[in-house]
Curated annotation (Swiss-Prot):
UniProt signal peptide: none
Name this polypeptide is given: Uncharacterized protein SYNPCC7002_A1628
Classification via InterPro entries: HDAC_classIV, HDAC_PDAC, His_deacetylse, His_deacetylse_dom, His_deacetylse_dom_sf, Ureohydrolase_dom_sf
Pfam families, per database record: Hist_deacetyl (PF00850)
Domain of life: Bacteria
Family the UniProt entry places it in: Belongs to the histone deacetylase family.
PANTHER family: HISTONE DEACETYLASE 12, HISTONE DEACETYLASE HDAC1-RELATED
Keywords, comma-separated and alphabetical: Hydrolase
The protein's role, per its UniProt record: Putative deacetylase.
Length: 300
């Protein structure tokens, strides 16, 4: 059987049609992977909702309560950038459960991919940039607490710095945060990851991949992680509305293949999330996200 893929219909919930967050992409990605034969139905696992205690390994209890009950201040809700509804709460919790399950499956099978996740702008006490709960951080702490893995490497290649994740783990020697992002982009105030690589605007495939290849192997041998989380944001694409870099589909596929094959060849299990992407055409965007799963199929 192929590598495990995590999906739940609750990854999608209605929000206003004109909203720039591409909510339908999760359902469309799952559909495209099946339609193109990248995955088979028996590879798909469905997550459960996470325990409240797991959320509170990262987030302040008052924040979790206020968000789930819809009692955040208007300012705090605006900072998140998504409208509040019971459906968005369910979607948020389900995606966190999905990343936790993806991590478990990666430890069992060597590689697993979520069809959502990567909410790296969420801080312990507030959400930001379409990110409400930090799934990467919650999954990391949950996996550690359950004794499944201790040393964690987070490879964040979304075009925006993983500021929430960096902040959460800034004093934690068991978690190494690596963010490679466009320097002149959201968030304007960066946090300090264990390794930050701020890239110039307009960087193309070859320039990008050269920098990544130069650092990745050394990083793995330095950190020696029990588990790698990989945030494969596709907003590095030249056609992305919020990206400012100049990667192509070919470059994205080469990137995914480089990360996965380097980790697997060295014997490190990888749990993947899809991260950000903001193309005008949602079908173009969904195809870009599918390159992660296509690369996973090809290296597994």
């Amino acid at each position: 059987m192929g590598f495990p893929v995590v999906y739940h219909p609750d990854y999608v919930t209605p929000i206003p049609e004109e909203h720039r967050f591409p909510m339908p992409k999760f359902r469309l990605l799952h559909g495209l992977l099946l339609e193109d034969g990248v995955i088979q139905p028996e590879q798909v696992y469905q997550p459960q909702l996470p325990d409240r205690a797991w959320l509170e390994l990262v987030h302040e209890p008052d924040y979790v309560t206020a968000y789930c009950q819809g009692t955040l201040t208007p300012k705090a809700q605006r900072r998140i950038g998504l409208p509040w509804s019971a459906g968005v709460v369910q979607r948020t919790l389900t995606a966190v459960g999905g990343t936790i399950l993806t991590a478990q499956l990666a430890l069992e099978h060597g590689l697993a991919c979520n069809t959502a996740g990567g909410t790296h702008h969420a801080f312990p006490g507030y959400g930001s940039g379409f990110c409400i709960l930090n799934d990467l951080a919650i999954a990391t702490r949950t996996i550690q607490q359950r004794g499944l893995a201790q040393r964690i490497l987070i490879v964040d290649l979304d075009v925006h710095q993983g500021d929430g994740t960096a902040f959460i783990f800034q004093d934690d020697p068991t978690v190494f945060t690596f963010s490679m992002h466009c320097e002149v982009n959201f968030p304007s105030q960066k946090q300090r990851s264990d390794l930050d690589l701020g890239l110039p605007e307009g960087l193309d495939d070859d320039g990008y991949l050269q920098i990544l290849a130069h650092h990745l192997e050394d990083l793995l041998s330095q950190v020696k992680p029990d588990l790698v989380f990989y945030d494969a944001g596709v907003d590095t694409h030249v056609g992305d509305r919020l990206g400012k870099l100049a990667m192509t589909n070919t470059g994205l596929y080469r990137r995914e293949r480089l990360v996965l094959s380097t980790c697997l060849a060295a014997g490190y299990p990888v749990a993947c999330v899809i991260g950000g992407g903001y193309a005008k055409n949602i079908h173009d965007l969904v195809y870009r996200h599918s390159l992660l799963h296509r690369a996973a199929r090809d290296v597994y």
